[in-house]
Amino acid sequence: MKKLIAVISISALFLTGCGSSDASTVNQGASEFAQTVTDPSVVILDVRTPGEFSSGHLANAINIDVEGMQFNSEVSKLDKTKTYAVYCRSGRRSVIATDEMQKLGFTKLFNLEGGTGAWSAAGQTLVTN
């Protein structure tokens, strides 16, 4: 019995130590992300280039290019207590952006899996204003 308890205790300790470091980013498909961005308290962050942004973006999105020289300084100006819905064209850059945002202290992050490609394929619209 003591052996069993020891094995369970060690296993629990090991599994706890293997928790995801990405716990504060929730990856969502287009339909889930569409629900998330309807909440007016959520900040929608487009991390594509300004040119990509101007060709079509989610309504009410702000644009900070993750590959731009000023990404960290611009993101650092944002309120870390708010919830952010982050997207790009394919989902690759938004993962990079949410990783950087976590390092800066952001904890409430949602990532659009598949980016605007998945968004459009799901019948969701982009705006150009």
Positions of predicted regions on the chain:
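Short cysteine clusters
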Residues: 88
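Rhodanese-like catalytic fold shared by cysteine-dependent sulfurtransferases
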Residues: 2-7, 13-42, 51-83, 92-129
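Structural scaffold elements adjacent to functional motifs in cytosolic proteins
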Residues: 44-46
